[in-house]
Amino acid sequence: MLIYMESLRVFWGELGAFRYGVILLFVLTLTYIYHVIRRCVIVSRKVKPIDKQEHEGVSVIITSHNNAECLRRNLPSFLMQAYDNFEVIVVDECSEDDTQDVLIEIQKDYPQLRCTRIFPDTKFRFTKKLAVNIGVLAAKHDILLFSEINCRPSSMYWVKTMESYFDENTAAVVGFANYDFTEQNVRNLRMFRFLRFIKMMVMVKNKKYIFWDGCNMAYRKSYYIENRGFAKNSQSYLGYDNDMVRELSRFGAIKMTKDPSSYVIIDKSDKKGEIN
């Protein structure tokens, strides 16, 4: 033991000015380990849903542009939710494919499906925020639940689970969305979205609301109206989810859920959800 200590002392003396670099590296390593442990604690901490006697109505809002096949494949999963009081609103963003025919066909089997349309000749045809605004104004219920048509809920209890996190002090709830773990050719994208979700959870803990995920998020219509929607930046196509959650954080708590029943699965065949 003494020999070891003496060798260490000699080695430390020979480092000279480099010893300060070693100290700095040691401090940085400890700081990194601390942040890793802190993130793991935050991610593992459970946010429990609220035990409600009465559940609120929910309006699911989905926008779609030339996605007839995605509508046919994924829309039934949104419509078959095990929830008593909900509707699904599809806003057709200037589609020129078979979108309208597909919606009419599906609507025959699901009366809770409501549709509205932005016609192709409108000058706002590429504004996502306009489509979201139209869907919000058409909604009957105060809780608005958003996703993309290149996604599908992982369970029949998606609506119920997301709604269960709302109380009078909740402004928004954000859930997890990712590619199916059985798909092998989207591993990098799946890891990116997983790490992104962890980062969002850490930011929420620190009251920082920088980016969000329009594939799986919910907020109250009343707060949206009070905030005047996207009036501050209505013409930008991207960032509709980020802008809104930042604004809504002024009205109440922003919650994130890791409940498996709240997960949304993204189609590997359509990567457009990555821009949100």
PLM segments and residue spans:
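N-terminal membrane-anchoring/stem segments of glycan-assembly enzymes
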Residues: 1-53
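Acidic donor-binding/catalytic loop of UDP-sugar-dependent glycosyltransferases
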Residues: 98, 148-164
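Catalytic donor/gating beta->alpha subdomain of glycosyltransferases that bind UDP-sugars
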Residues: 166, 172-195, 222-225, 229-276
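Glycine-rich, basic loop-to-helix element that forms the pyrophosphate-binding segment
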Residues: 119-139
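Short aromatic/hydrophobic "clamp" motif used to bind/position activated sugar donors
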Residues: 144
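Short, well-formed alpha-helical segments that are part of the catalytic scaffolds
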Residues: 43-45, 67-80
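Acidic donor-binding segment of Leloir-type glycosyltransferases
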Residues: 76-121
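Cell-envelope/extracellular polymer assembly enzymes that use nucleotide-activated donors
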Residues: 56-59, 87
